[in-house]
Amino acid sequence: MDRVPVLKIGDLLLVSIQVDMQDQTALALQEDLAERIVATGCHGVIIDITALDIVDSFVGRMLSSIASISRVLDAETVVVGMRPAVAITLVELGLSLDGIRTALNVERGIELLAQAREPETPDDLGIDLDLDRFGPATS
Amino acid sequence: MGLTAAEGERIAALLDTQADKLTASWTDAVAAPLRGRLTRAELQRQVQDLHRAIVEALRAGAFDLTDERSADLRATLVELSRGRARQGFTASETAVTVFGLKQALFDVVDVRGGDAQVLADLLAVGQVIDDLGLFTFETYAKAREGLIADQAEQLLELATPVVKLWEGVVAIPLVGTLDSARAQVVMERLLETLVETGSPYAIIDITGVPAVDTQVAQHILKTVVAARLMGAECIISGIRPQIAQTIVALGIEFGDIATKATLADALRHALRLIEATRKARSN
Amino acid sequence: MTTDVGLGEPQLVTIAADEDVVRVRQLVRTVAVAAKLSLVDQTKLVTAASELARNTLVYGGGGGAEVTVVDSGRRKGIRIVFADDGPGIADLDLALTDGYTTGGGLGLGLSGARRLVDEFDIDTAAGRGTRITVTKWAR
Ligand SMILES: Nc1ncnc2c1ncn2[C@@H]1O[C@H](COP(=O)(O)OP(=O)(O)O)[C@@H](O)[C@H]1O
Ligand SMILES: [Mg+2]
């Protein structure tokens, strides 16, 4: 069975799915990725599916699982490079990929991850407002 | 071709003995109705090809156009009719190329002085030529159909231009009646352009669309969902009051899809979103 | 007439393991390209085939897929028959409901595949195995 390589680039993990994956390969990727997130402490994962000429419900479910598992491990996932024909087919299949962030290409994916991390910086406006609600003592 | 072996042999001989005179006369017969739209040299070459193919098929013992041994003859006829269809000749202008052989035979063969055998053979060959003519006609019709379908598709694509309005924003201004087939082409073109230009925003402007039905509304909706799966957002602009009523009456949920009155409003909206993204990043 | 790949003669893939599902996808893609299906239609058919081949393996306990190029006289198409001698499907309406699964899947394989093809026919009963025939026509 082939394994999909997981690359660390800067503070991101990049997965380029290149092969026509067997189901077992997809499951292995899910495990590998969880381990690598913990081992590297990365907070962002980009899954590039440019090379995939179909996404069926099994791969769709794998993508959703990866996104959920990553979130539990404090990492955001972005799926990038979905082909138009694949997207049209997924709509007809009825797969909504709920909870998965998507971007047109790797570059846009990186932007999206950068944005996603923003609100967690301590000086963020949202947090100030939240704290205000607990009374003047904290401000 | 509905001939006996002996007939086939005799007709092949008949066609072959005065080959040059026959093909010259045949070329004349074909050239007249085409009124110089093909050069004589070109016609002559086509007629000679056809003549050779017919004689060879008869010699090979092919008495039927569906016969394995007629493959070459069929190919010659197909090439001829496709060429004519592509060049814009009519069906009868195409068929005349084959029927010209009849005329030529009467010119070349001595009908009056001929014996009964020759007359019978001429009748038989007439049948053969009719078969060839019919086949040509059918092939021509098929080729025309194919051409028309191709042109329709090209028109469809011409009628749905996707334009890049701004860095990161493409727009598709739809004009005219949207049927299901065109809506599908639009959907694919738009999504492809998103990828090609790397634009995360698309404006679907339907100001020029007089009405939509359920299917078309569904197509637009699916386009928006597909674009989201790819990581892009669509904004729909120019929804006419009647169309808004139709959409609601049909019970189609546009949900959280951004809609704007005009293309300009939609562009402004997209630019604001792009600006917000940039600010968030540079903070 | 070399473009009529497999016209009339079915091509068979045995489905007994994970990698056979990949083989079904690849064969269907090749035949769909040869039959001149549009890219979107190819993608829809391959996706449907992937779903049904996986069901044949997972729920039917293995079986086969038979791919044939068909000609209606007006246009060409591709017909695929998935057959297994597994437990069959007792309640077909239920199995064809979006989201229904007995195997922890997304429950979109059967219902989604039906939406992705032009003709969908299913012959099954409890204890009698399952035979699904799908056809997609070139437009
Ligand atoms: N070939 C088959 N043999 C027996 N049961 C099947 C077969 N295919 C599908 N099923 C049943 O139909 C249900 C729905 O299938 P499907 O829509 O593909 O969803 P999923 O694969 O996610 O479970 C399956 O969970 C299974 O119970
Ligand atoms: Mg399934």
Report residues per predicted region.
Chain A
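STAS-typified acidic loop motif
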Residues: 2-30
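Short, conserved, surface-exposed binding loops centered on an aromatic residue
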Residues: 5-8, 35-39
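A short acidic, often aromatic-flanked loop/helix-cap motif at beta-alpha or helix-coil junctions
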Residues: 14, 108-111
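Short, solvent-exposed amphipathic alpha-helical segments in soluble enzyme
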Residues: 30-34, 64-65
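Catalytic cores of nucleotide-enabled group-transfer and carboxylate-activating enzymes in metabolic
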Residues: 37-40, 66, 111-116
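Amphipathic alpha-helical interaction surfaces in cytosolic regulatory modules
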Residues: 40-43, 47-96
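Short acidic-hydrophobic, aromatic-tinged amphipathic segments that line or gate anion-handling sites
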Residues: 99-109
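Intrinsically disordered or compositionally simple regulatory linkers and C-terminal tails
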Residues: 115-139
